[in-house]
């Protein structure tokens, strides 16, 4: 997915540069990240690499650290500065739609990345099919449970499009299995500590379940850590989403038998 973003940005800017050979200028890309984590940091590094590959490009990075008010301010600042292209990963579905619309109406191309906003005033969306991800995980767990079992869900940020879509896909996948129940669902806000606290809340209510479906690997790891603190980590199967091929990432955790998937 990162490669597609990288490609569309530089094709677009390449065409602009070709059209402006007579008057070279700096093309400014404003990048508004909703949060900070391993894969977003990797994406930022790849985008910044563009400055070394083409000295006509300036990449400005901003992260709101899950703060809707701050992200609105950052996007509007990019608009006021007159950037040539905006790449935005909205924190929540409706939180920055007005700022996105303002940029688009000012004639600034807007690429929504990873997450959507509830407006149609944007140039392109690049992201994965989060509904399909949730449905695939639901199908996987249903098959592992052979149609009967109890699941707890640890969700991403309430109101964020990946959390909404992954939940919907998961629930649709297990709908044909009346013997499978989601007995608890807690928000973890995409953070490891959020996963810890969500799992602790669940374990206070009940310890009678089979699987943990977490909307991200960080949430799943937090849930695992919370269970481990109570000596319960071997009682449950943990699943997450991301599969980063880094130290401590999802692929390594599956390989080591900590995550089921």
Question: What does each model-found stretch correspond to?
Answer:
Residues 32-45, 60-70, 92, 115, ...:
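Hinge/beta->alpha junction and helix N-cap segments in small-molecule ligand-binding domains
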Residues 93-132, 140-143, 150, 156, ...:
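Flexible loop/hinge segments that line or gate small-molecule binding clefts
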Residues 21-23:
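Bacterial signal peptide processing site
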Residues 16-19:
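C-terminal motif of bacterial Sec signal peptides marking the signal peptidase cleavage site
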